[in-house]
Amino acid sequence: MIRILIAGFALLPLLAAQSNYPPVQSLIERSKSAMNRTARVPLAEDPAGHTPNFVRALSLTPKAQKPMADLFETMIYQGSVEPELKLAIGLRIAQIYNSPYLAVHTERRLRSTERGREVLALLGTTPISSSSKTPESLAIGYGEALTKAVLGVTNDQFAAVKARYNDSQVVELTTTTCMFNYLVRFVEALALPTEPWALQAEDASRRGFHAPEARISLISDAQITAVETAQKQSRENNTLGVGFANSMRAMFLNPAGATAWRNYGNASREYASVDRPLKLHISFAVSMVNGCRYCTVHQVVGLRRAGVDPNKLMAMKKDDSQLSPRELTAVEYARKRTRAPNSTTDADYQKLKEVFGEQGALEVVMQTANFAYMNRFTDGLRLPSEDEGVKIYQEIYGEGSYESYRVKR
């Protein structure tokens, strides 16, 4: 009890700002009625009766089911940041986007440990105060700011986070935030119902976390192996021609998370009802909405290498006049989903299915969510574009166009 009270007083600044989030308990109550929702996609069979619906929703892309489950578990329970802080970031994102489904899946895990209950008690309805410098408020505030805007973390806020967390931990906090931004868009796009078992606290007896002893990040065997594997794959399938991308160089500071994300992405890309150029149109549109310079450059490079005319690429920076009806359907959906994850309707998804088929509609959802992740990771960390990407971008948009577009530090 004393520990809880001390933690509560230490984190009172968390509750100091104007209230603007739904209470956690109200989201949990709403998740009960969401058990009756009808998913917009067929759900895979669940003989054991304990598979999350966000995994079952990949029945049309079955090779991605296990990597999705592994991604969720890895991001939360591996690394050097305590799982409860990462779950708190996920629950805060559920509050920001008003997602009962994401709330119940993070709250049940927080509720299962003493530390989780301490953190849960501090997640009220208010945004994080910028004056608070406790480890908890820095981590949750970082995830909150990055969720609200790709460039939402200020230099001062980032410096405060860096003063408490090392580079690997900052990447871990970032990928955690990115993963939950992916997940909330995925589950809300597909109107996934709450599983009855999700209302019960998780059995935490099999979990364990040990804080690292070293004051700095150590290069692990896993990190070395993961980077070697990724470099080999990059050489074999270098579709953008930029080599080992800076996004990967940064991501592998958290090797377990980077490997889980790559495994999920590789499995997802085995399905191509929607062709690569159209997926690049989707990610270009999402990156433009989010103002992500790094990912916009990559999509321009990809589209140009796929044979898209430079005149069309020029027009796409201004309006949709050069898009085909098929492209426009995907792009308009992606923009709507990017701006407000819980805003799309059954009619919106039905239109996707009519144009792209059932599997193609799911691929549009996944590609949109991919860049909710990647935009926040790359420009959130202010990663520089690779020289080859800048070269091609300026060949299309003119000399100096990249400098005028890049993030001002």
PLM features per residue range, with description:
Residues 5-14:
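Bacterial N-terminal signal peptides
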Residues 1-2:
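N-terminal secretory signal peptides that target proteins for export/translocation
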Residues 16-409:
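Hydrophobic alpha-helical segments
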